[in-house]
Amino acid sequence: MSDAAVDTSSEITTKDLKEKKEVVEEAENGRDAPANGNAENEENGEQEADNEVDEEEEEGGEEEEEEEEGDGEEEDGDEDEEAESATGKRAAEDDEDDDVDTKKQKTDEDD
């Protein structure tokens, strides 16, 4: 009988840990936890749809930001140009970071 009691308590602990993990992940992703705190009770279709939306946001998030900033400026549908400009901006930011690192290295070598 004591084995059954141990199994029950370990299942509750595992379930609690899963719920906490899901709540933390949802908080990191900017989504609220379900009202009952039980993410497992959501319908599978809703969970799959949420996952698909998250993947799309991760892949094309920066393009969407560019489109929002440029509302009305370019409506001819040249998304390639917007993607290239976004990539160029990222490359420029990376170059700035490299310059700062280089300056720090030179200072360290002089000391």
From Swiss-Prot:
The modification N6-succinyllysine is found at K15. The modification N-acetylmethionine is found at M1. The keyword Phosphoprotein applies. It is found in: Nucleus. The modification Phosphoserine is found at S2, S9, S10. There is a cross-link at K103 (Glycyl lysine isopeptide (Lys-Gly) (interchain with G-Cter in SUMO2)). Residues 13-31, 101-111 have a biased composition (Basic and acidic residues). Keywords: Acetylation, Isopeptide bond, Nucleus, Phosphoprotein, Ubl conjugation. Coiled coil: none annotated. Its main location: nucleus. Residues 1-111 are annotated as: Disordered. The modification N6-acetyllysine is found at K15, K103. The modification N-acetylserine is found at S2. The modification Phosphothreonine is found at T8, T13, T14, T102, T107. It comes from the Eukaryota. One of its GO terms (cellular component) is nucleus. Pfam families: Prothymosin. GO terms for biological process: chromatin organization; DNA-templated transcription; negative regulation of apoptotic process; positive regulation of transcription by RNA polymerase II. Residues 40-84 have a biased composition (Acidic residues). Interacts with NUPR1; regulates apoptotic process. Belongs to the pro/parathymosin family. Prothymosin alpha may mediate immune function by conferring resistance to certain opportunistic infections. This is Prothymosin alpha.
